[in-house]
Amino acid sequence: MKSPRNSPDSSFSKDENPIIAGPSLKMYSQSTPHPDFWLYDGSIVLSVESCLFRVHQTILANHSEIFSDLFTVPQPAEDAEEMMEGCRIVHLPDSESDFVDLLNAIYHPECALLPLTLVVWLVSNHLITFHFASYFDSISADADLETVLTFIQGILHLSTKYIIHYLRQRCISLFLTKFPSTLDGYTLKAGASNREKYKSDNVMRAINLARQNNVLEVLPYAFYCIARLPHKRILKDRTMDISWKDKAMCLVGRERLKWAQTSLSHVFLLNFQRAPLCQSSLCAFARGPHSEWHVLDCMKSPNPLHAYDNWDNLNVCADCVAYCKLRHMKGREEVWDRLPDLFELPTWNELRNAQNM
């Protein structure tokens, strides 16, 4: 249930704005109470940029050890009189928009142990219900990458900074829907009917966001996406791009992806081998695999994770097709396992462990 809220305009008149009510509050004359998070029963006022938030100290402290410690640390003597409507004022050096996103996530928590709709009672033959929804439910399941990054950016940054584990994990889970950390996740994403084609700027934004907030699991596949871009785009110097060190590693990784495609995932085309149970001597002379390899090799960028599906073009027996599928599957699995190493990153497990420290 939402906490009662008052719009600033409904709490004080224009002539009696508490922001400028006393001498000690003159510094807040340019600050504005937030319309959604100036709660009449709030116990602490947080000053973030030019905005004031009157919220519940215990709620924030229960979500974050950092907030708990912050609120219990005595203020310097010169700050002792910084009060507003009986509430202590605490300054936070954060972004106003990021903090609004964080408060939305905290004040609209997920009720994980309850159904979306909880039946409360029956009155006059009508069911009275409450609906429990998380702030994260407000983003569509098929939202594009840019929308997801904008949605999680502030929450991820502040939940990492203030050690709010469950919100950080929700952001990471959303992040991984766009940059999977498992081959199954990649296969599910790649096979979707509404598969999204990422813009290069958004992928670079994702890498920067991941690095800033220690979300290391997303890096291997994000680097994979950058490595497949045209050289001209990678070498462009744009303000919000990834570092030149990361760009250099993506260019090196691009060459390694070519090797992985040739030697691992699609080796069944370049180095065709008959199935052990093959009964047709014609398969040994089939030209289909080599022809398919030349088509693949002419592609502009390597894509060793791509699932090959033109099996009829091989013109070999069913046993040989099954054997090729097995080699292809094992090759893709090996590419995925090696993906971090192709970009000079630690192993998948090491990335996860470092991310969760």
Language model features: what each stretch is:
Residues 1-62, 66, 97, 101, ...:
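N-terminal BTB/POZ boundary and linker segment
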Residues 2-7, 11, 180-357:
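Acidic, serine/threonine- and proline-rich low-complexity regulatory tracts
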Residues 53, 60, 91-95, 141-148, ...:
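Amphipathic alpha-helical protein-protein interaction segments
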Residues 53-55, 99-107, 117-133, 152-156, ...:
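Short, structured motif recognition centered on aromatic/hydrophobic residues
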Residues 68-72, 76, 111-122, 138-154, ...:
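A cross-kingdom feature marking solvent-exposed beta-strand/loop segments within repeated
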Residues 72, 76-85, 251-257:
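A low-complexity, Ser/Thr/Gly/Pro-enriched, surface-exposed linker/loop concept
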Residues 80-84, 93-100:
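Eukaryotic helix-linker segments that join adjacent hydrophobic helices
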Residues 147, 170-171:
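A short alpha-helix capping/helix-loop junction motif
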